[in-house]
């Protein structure tokens, strides 16, 4: 698996339960080859427009994503997961979308000037 892939992984939810969910692999983390991931959800109404991005069947990379329904790529729902938490790869997003999401995350994490 590599950055930009969408995989199924065991991910802790806000209520503390662990569920197998689609995740986007954002960055491989040294030294143990864990991955920084963000969750993917079909709950479009939970969108945080300054962070999240919707992917729909009208998007050129939807088919290659492996997702089955319009979904939110939730940049604000981050986790670092070991390889053992992944059940397998289902697809990938375009490099253009990955770059845009990484820029959005980087900008969000940058200190705000007061």
Stretch-by-stretch model annotation:
Residues 1-114:
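Conserved functional hotspots at enzyme active or ligand-binding sites that engage polyanionic ligands
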